[in-house]
Amino acid sequence: MAKEKFDRSKEHANIGTIGHVDHGKTTLTAAIATVLAKNGDTVAQSYDMIDNAPEEKERGITINTAHIEYQTDKRHYAHVDCPGHADYVKNMITGAAQMDGGILVVSAADGPMPQTREHILLSRNVGVPALVVFLNKVDMVDDEELLELVEMEVRDLLSEYDFPGDDVPVIAGSALKALEGDAEYEQKILDLMQAVDDYIPTPERDSDKPFMMPVEDVFSITGRGTVATGRVERGQIKVGEEVEIIGMHETSKTTVTGVEMFRKLLDYAEAGDNIGALLRGVAREDVQRGQVLAAPGSITPHTKFKAEVYVLSKDEGGRHTPFFTNYRPQFYFRTTDVTGVVNLPEGTEMVMPGDNVEMTVELIAPIAIEDGTRFSIREGGRTVGSGVVTEIFE
């Protein structure tokens, strides 16, 4: 059977279900796919198929994640659902499943629970732009006032973590009833997806962002100059444009005088391309792995930042023992390791393998970073943690 061609005419967005264990995230995921399948462009998915999520490796961390896709009239969605709480934490911190928006599932029978709070906090820290709420299991609640109370609690909780709690759409329904084909509850799923379509902003495509390419390798071509190679992470670069060389040393400027891909000369390159960029007037020793080429003024070098970090458990090949403030591992950003010193928050004595923690880091050399930059923490070449920058200090 020939593979279907991916339809690019529709907007694409990545979303995921978040919320407390057993509040119905996976049932909702199955219900969305099943209800949308009745309306056309989507393949129905069973609960079991989603629940038996395959293991994936991301930055050396094992994560169970189910990926499904479905379509509304407006968009094509890639939806990620995780079976376990630990999988969520890892998923959000490593960026294994980049989320342009989330559906927060809260059981109307229980109200917000500890993981509800934790997932909202994580969404805020890792930069999920918008959340929509699905109050699930409303068929189990007879009291209209109780529903209103739960909705208020959820809105307050969202506001507490800097989401616009008063404006976030809240849809009440029952994923199980929708999955069983109850027309009233199927409509609630369509209402939810309408809210997701309308409320979650269309993500900016990588190729529309300012240019950046992490440098992987550098060599000189006699008579032509210095070439930096790497994969364009975002944006586009055209021959003749200026770029900055950022990280490790003082930032410098140069002009890209040639772009090559697979030994062919190009006029321009864009996000996803593996290229060699010929740099005017740059000596081979002026560029090194770990730096980035970037559109002038788009990203700056820093040494001190706050980050949300997941520490690998012993079973995942991580440390066997806890670490404390002043721990000095390597921080691996894009293509290189830089030593850094860890400062734990007040009241956190130590961090155990398997924990997630917010920490402050000071690197010994500046690196091009911004909010949302991902990194790994390594010791002697093995990964012991994974993190995302949440705030920059200096």
Curated annotation (Swiss-Prot):
Subcellular location: Cytoplasm
Recorded catalytic activity of this chain's protein: GTP + H2O = GDP + phosphate + H(+)
EC id: 3.6.5.3
Binding site residues for GTP: 19-26, 81-85, 136-139
G3: region residues: 81-84
EC class of the enzyme, as a word: hydrolase
Alphabetical keyword list: Cytoplasm, Elongation factor, GTP-binding, Hydrolase, Magnesium, Metal-binding, Nucleotide-binding, Protein biosynthesis
InterPro entries: EF-Tu_GTP-bd, EF-Tu_GTPase, EFTu-like_2, EFTU_2, G_TR_CS, P-loop_NTPase, Small_GTP-bd, T_Tr_GTP-bd_dom
UniProt keyword Hydrolase present: yes
Record has Membrane as a keyword: no
Name of one Pfam family that matches: GTP_EFTU_D2
NCBIfam families given in the database record: EF-Tu, PRK00049.1, PRK12735.1, PRK12736.1, small_GTP
Function as written in the Swiss-Prot or TrEMBL entry: GTP hydrolase that promotes the GTP-dependent binding of aminoacyl-tRNA to the A-site of ribosomes during protein biosynthesis.
Homology family: Belongs to the TRAFAC class translation factor GTPase superfamily. Classic translation factor GTPase family. EF-Tu/EF-1A subfamily.
Protein name: Elongation factor Tu
This protein's encoding gene: tuf
